[in-house]
């Protein structure tokens, strides 16, 4: 709302028509408008580049609404987004005819709140509409582990969320079902050997969140499948 994008765009493209909206703008050059109520019918047949920093909302719900709305008429979408949009599950919000062209991590303290630096784990992505649909990455089939319930005599527990995400050991009884996965290792694999290799893996996906670290089953399987026996 303070024109961080607008003022730079006007310098770069002085001859282009630039519309700027915010529900509570800080400068006069930005019109007061709820973007999700913007009437795009008069411009939907033109080349439209949408650039901004949509509000994230709880579990990214608001920025997902912005993305879905933009996909109806945009040629490109360039947004600051929660870091969780590095995950394949979040990328699915974009229609399949949009292709990811750029994704970069923002520096720490990239935001300002009440005139103070504010850190929100975020990225900047550029998506472009094309005539072909992008390929959807399918979840991998697990090679070595089977997810089971705690009461089904699992071999190992794996921390699912929190500061110790992906911590894996044989302790089962004191582990919470809300914060852990429970797995059986396939019968032809030695559990101790698997555990040793597991604990050497680098699970980068666990850091792709705005809140506490976490890892999904598909993300876990993708990395565990790289183990070689």
Which functions belong to the PLM regions below?
Residues 1-229:
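Class I S-adenosyl-L-methionine-dependent methyltransferase catalytic core
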């Amino acid at each position: 709302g303070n024109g961080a994008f607008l003022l730079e765009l006007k310098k770069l493209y002085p001859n282009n028509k630039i519309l700027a909206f915010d529900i509570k703008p800080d400068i006069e050059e930005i019109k007061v408008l709820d973007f999700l109520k913007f009437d795009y019918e008069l411009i939907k047949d033109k080349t439209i580049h949408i650039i901004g920093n949509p509000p994230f909302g709880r579990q990214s719900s608001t920025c997902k609404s912005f993305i879905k709305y933009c996909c109806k008429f945009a040629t490109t979408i360039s947004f600051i987004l929660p870091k969780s949009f590095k995950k394949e599950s979040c990328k699915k919000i974009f229609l399949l005819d949009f292709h990811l062209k750029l994704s970069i991590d923002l520096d720490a303290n990239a935001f300002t709140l009440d005139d103070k630096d504010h850190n929100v784990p975020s990225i900047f992505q550029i998506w472009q509409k094309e005539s072909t649909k992008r390929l959807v990455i399918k979840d991998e089939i697990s090679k070595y582990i089977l997810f089971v319930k705690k009461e089904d005599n699992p071999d190992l527990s794996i921390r699912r969320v929190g500061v110790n995400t992906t911590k894996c050991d044989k302790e089962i009884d004191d582990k919470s079902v809300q914060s852990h996965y429970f797995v059986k290792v396939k019968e032809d694999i030695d559990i101790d050997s698997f555990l040793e290799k597991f604990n050497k893996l680098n699970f980068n996906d666990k850091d792709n969140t705005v809140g506490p670290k976490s890892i999904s089953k598909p993300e876990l399987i993708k990395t565990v499948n790289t183990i070689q026996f």
